[in-house]
């Protein structure tokens, strides 16, 4: 993180759920902490507050090694909205300025392909939570459920999903194919 911070004029995001890694990352020049567990581990909330960094709160059902084993929701979009709303309340309760916080619905993290597409179709519901919505749809396996393509052949579909997400309220798009995604978004925004 230190080397990246010294060589690049950009915000460095560190993906971690471990409070000690959060603290060290903040000391080394990270600009954003991205926690797939939504800052739920012991001491994660306070460590995030103490860091002063921007935060990305993500939804994930289950744990990484079991999250894709029969994920179940009563209503995938409402359940995720409620989870993120509760996490935002917890962040605020420890003194975190919510202007520092973005939310990520966690496409592909404890969701079936059908649940991911339902989430994308109704993504604007999450915009109502008042925080910028970040999406990571690039090369996701949900694409292969429709197109049956390996990850390296999912660029066009990934760009299409990014456009759909922005149209439905996403403000930050995580992408593998940055140039293609940026070109498509630039063209889309001209109309």
What kind of region is each of these model predictions?
Residues 2-11, 16-22, 26-27, 31-90, ...:
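Active-site-adjacent loop and "lid" segments of alpha/beta metabolic enzymes
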Residues 10, 97-100:
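Short acidic capping loops at alpha-helix termini that bridge into adjacent secondary structure
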Residues 94:
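Conserved C-terminal portion of the radical SAM core fold
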Residues 107:
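Active-site metal-binding loops of divalent metal-dependent hydrolases
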């Amino acid at each position: 993180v230190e080397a990246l911070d010294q060589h690049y004029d950009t915000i460095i995001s560190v993906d971690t759920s471990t409070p000690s890694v959060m603290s060290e990352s903040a000391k080394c020049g990270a600009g954003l902490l991205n926690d797939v567990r939504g800052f739920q581990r012991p001491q994660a909330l306070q460590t995030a507050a103490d860091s002063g960094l921007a935060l990305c709160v993500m939804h994930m059902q289950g744990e990484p090694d079991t999250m894709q084993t029969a994920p179940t929701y009563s209503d995938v979009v409402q359940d995720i909205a409620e989870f993120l709303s509760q996490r935002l309340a917890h962040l605020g309760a420890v003194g975190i300025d919510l202007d520092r916080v973005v939310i990520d619905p966690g496409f592909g993290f404890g969701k079936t392909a059908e649940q991911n597409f339902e989430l994308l179709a109704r993504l604007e519901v999450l915009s109502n939570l008042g925080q910028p919505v970040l999406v990571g749809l690039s090369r996701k396996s949900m694409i292969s459920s429709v197109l049956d393509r390996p990850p390296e052949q999912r660029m066009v579909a990934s760009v299409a999903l990014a456009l759909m997400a922005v149209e439905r309220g996403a403000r930050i798009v995580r992408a593998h194919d940055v140039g293609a995604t940026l070109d498509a978004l630039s063209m889309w925004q001209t109309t």
